[in-house]
Amino acid sequence: MQDRECEEIIETAEGPSVCAPSEQHAERETSAFQEECAYGMKVWIRLPHDEALAAVRHALGERGFTIACEMDVGRLIRDKLGITYPGYTILGVSLPDAMHQALELDRDMGLILPHHVIVYEQSAGSVIAAVDVIAEMAIADGRDLREIARVSNEKLREVINLASSGVGFEA
């Protein structure tokens, strides 16, 4: 994938951005590239929405996450507004141990839990994105919460890497 193609895909998704150099893309068989966004991390992969969503579910399970809730945004918009909308799914996910620890430190943490992972159709493929848990939990104070957020964030990064690499996954 050429640098200009990457820039066009990102611009289509959210305005101007810069993609990593093309030689880094040659190493990835899935034609994926990852970037940070203001409040999360994301990767574009050359898979349709349903296959990308299946890969994410698999990767979440592999990394110990529980899917607490799921919202099919495309269907919701179609059903409630009568507007055709491309595939867009929001998953509410948590690491049970981390959630328990956070709630023991601050019962009101439930206001920002679970963490969100999204999968949506974009430019002949899909985007997989996850919230930056450190940024999400920054509104709460406490050194112990920062460590819980750091661990959760690292595991979400692993989920995105695993889902975009196709390692150990068959649709």
Please provide the spans of the model-predicted regions.
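N-terminal acidic, proline/glycine-rich, low-complexity intrinsically disordered segments
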Residues: 1-8
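Short glycine-/small-residue-rich flexible loop motifs, especially phosphate/cofactor-binding loops
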Residues: 57, 75, 157
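Compact, glycine-rich, soluble single-domain proteins
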Residues: 63-119
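Well-ordered alpha/beta subsegment
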Residues: 139-171
